[in-house]
Amino acid sequence: MIDAACAELLSPGSLRVGINKGNILLVTGEADNGDPEGIAPDMGRALAEHLGVEVYYQCFSSPGEVADAAERQEIDVGLIAEEPKRAEVISFCDPYLEIEATYLVPAGSPLRTIDDVDAPGIRIAVSERAAYDLYLSRTLQHATLHRARGLPGAFRLFIDEKLDALAGLVPALEENAESIIGARVIPGRYTAVQQAIGTLHDRPAMKAAVQAFLRKTKSIGFVAELIDKHGVTGKLQVAK
């Protein structure tokens, strides 16, 4: 299986790993040589070791850019959230992490529940092409989405335009809430973002090898160890 997977690599002997640096829960720093550090880079490196090849990181500022690179066949695998729209260009394997998504609302907001937010006239700031943006684009019936580049951009838009809510991942929103007096994170979730490894559609051996790698890493507790190693315990959960 591994030999067949390696035969499908874009560059012999090297695994091109697409990394979304915009997810600060999964990419928490940068090494002296410029390589990204965090759970996602560690998963990419471990996958390369599983295949017996070198790892080569290609970093992007958003998950949408990772998907674009996969569509152009510039990467072998991408570590981003599984989402139906992205599955048009990426063949996703089983998820390895799960992160809940909800809303942040300003002080004095009458919005109390997830359902309250989807109402006529409600304006929601969101990180463009994030998994939860794609999810909300499919499911919201009344509220409108206002997009910005990355969560920092969406947070700035939320503040500057005095929008009604900010959509995002729970751990990041909890940090945002600390910087706004009276802001609240709405309890519950509208979705749980499934972080996964995706391959190109025409790489069946690579997908099979990644699936085998994921089964092994979850069974031996490797993913849980990475959560502890990178200081995000309690913010992320190992996917079932």
What are these regions (language model features)?
Residues 21, 98-108, 170, 174-215, ...:
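Periplasmic-binding protein-like
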Residues 13-21, 37, 115-132, 144-145:
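Short loop->beta-strand "edge-of-pocket" segments that line small-molecule binding or catalytic clefts
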Residues 1-7, 11, 131-148, 215-240:
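Ligand-binding clefts/hinges and TM-proximal coupling segments of bilobed small-molecule sensing domains
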Residues 96, 105-123:
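Flexible hinge/capping segments at coil-to-helix
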Residues 1-81, 86:
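Extracytoplasmic small-molecule ligand-binding "clamshell" domains
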Residues 27-33, 44-54, 93, 120, ...:
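Ligand-binding cleft/hinge of the Venus flytrap
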Residues 64, 80-89, 157-191:
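A ligand-binding cleft/hinge motif common to bilobed small-molecule-binding domains
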Residues 56-68, 111-112, 146-157, 193:
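Short helix-initiation/N-cap motifs at beta->coil->alpha
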